[in-house]
């Protein structure tokens, strides 16, 4: 079984996947694969982002034959890949702000990522892709996992628990006042 690990930049996708690799699971980091395959189509300097060839990466994931079951495909666009399950990592915006500052992100990029996490862009995209336009209820193969306050090992364990039980967390930053205040501080950069 191939499982996508996705989420807003900074939520801990790579860190969680490295912990899963340490536990013996196969992991593909799509950003690394995109560089190795020369599948980066352009650099969006204004957004400080790379535009990748999704068709080439989908083909790569389809043809990938991992040894472990499950195996993980990691990227903020992994939910667009042909996988059996999507895990969307979620992180409280105040913690995301701290991490992005530590990584040296400029305020404009922090604002973009905080807003994306606050409204659940990756989760919404995954639901849209997996539900094929039918939004009566979220598809069962898209699961949110809140990693706020968890260690690397705890987050990996939480992901495996969500995979095994096909159940995750209900995440709603929109009704969280601290999350609202965190995002509001960055509105001037949007």
From Swiss-Prot:
Taxonomy of the source species: Archaea, Methanobacteriati, Methanobacteriota, Methanomada group, Methanopyri
Annotated TM spans: none
GO molecular function, one term: ATP hydrolysis activity
SUPFAM superfamilies (alphabetical): P-loop containing nucleoside triphosphate hydrolases
Species this protein is from: Methanopyrus kandleri (strain AV19 / DSM 6324 / JCM 9639 / NBRC 100938)
Enzyme Commission code: 2.7.4.3
Superkingdom per UniProt: Archaea
Classification via HAMAP family: Adenylate_kinase_AK6
Keyword Transmembrane among record annotations: no
LID, as annotated region: 102-112
Subunit structure: Interacts with uS11. Not a structural component of 40S pre-ribosomes, but transiently interacts with them by binding to uS11.
Biological function: Broad-specificity nucleoside monophosphate (NMP) kinase that catalyzes the reversible transfer of the terminal phosphate group between nucleoside triphosphates and monophosphates. Also has ATPase activity. Involved in the late maturation steps of the 30S ribosomal particles, specifically 16S rRNA maturation. While NMP activity is not required for ribosome maturation, ATPase activity is. Associates transiently with small ribosomal subunit protein uS11. ATP hydrolysis breaks the interaction with uS11.
GO biological process: ribosomal small subunit biogenesis; rRNA processing
Record field: catalytic activity: AMP + ATP = 2 ADP; ATP + H2O = ADP + phosphate + H(+)
Stated name of the protein: Putative adenylate kinase
EC class (word): transferase
Keywords: ATP-binding, Kinase, Nucleotide-binding, Ribosome biogenesis, rRNA processing, Transferase
Entry keyword annotation includes Lipid metabolism: no
Chain segments carrying region NMP: 29-52
Family according to the record: Belongs to the adenylate kinase family. AK6 subfamily.
Binding site for ATP: 10, 12-15
